């Protein structure tokens, strides 16, 4: 589906974070806002410091916070927790990402 393609484009594997019901309820703006919050949190936030997003059009929102910082070789990496709230329902996901040479964060 186009929603799953958007998740792939956003660098998020749908199944790794969100159930299909929640993912199917997110629009392109939600996905991009969640991605931007995730990238900001991974780059800038201390462990357990949240980055939040809220789409005023859809009413959907979420938070992401790093839970651990570590290295793989020369790459800084972080574990994180992400909570997406759609229609009052919270879906929690966990992930790991490492910073690439170009400064982007790649999910592991």
Feature roles, as predicted:
Residues 33-94:
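Amphipathic, membrane-inserting segments
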Residues 86, 101-102:
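Short, intrinsically disordered/low-complexity patches at protein termini
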Residues 95-101:
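Short beta-strand segments and strand-loop junctions that repeat across beta-rich extracellular domains
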């Amino acid at each position: 589906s186009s929603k799953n393609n958007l998740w792939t484009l956003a660098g998020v594997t749908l199944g790794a974070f969100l159930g299909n019901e929640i993912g199917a309820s997110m629009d392109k703006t939600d996905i991009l806002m969640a991605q931007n919050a995730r990238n900001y949190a991974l780059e800038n936030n201390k462990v357990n410091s949240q980055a939040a997003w809220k789409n005023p059009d859809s009413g959907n929102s979420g938070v992401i916070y790093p839970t651990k910082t570590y290295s793989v070789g020369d790459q800084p990496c972080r574990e994180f927790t992400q909570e997406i709230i759609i229609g009052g329902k919270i879906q929690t996901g966990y992930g790991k990402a490492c910073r690439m040479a170009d400064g982007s964060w790649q999910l592991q």
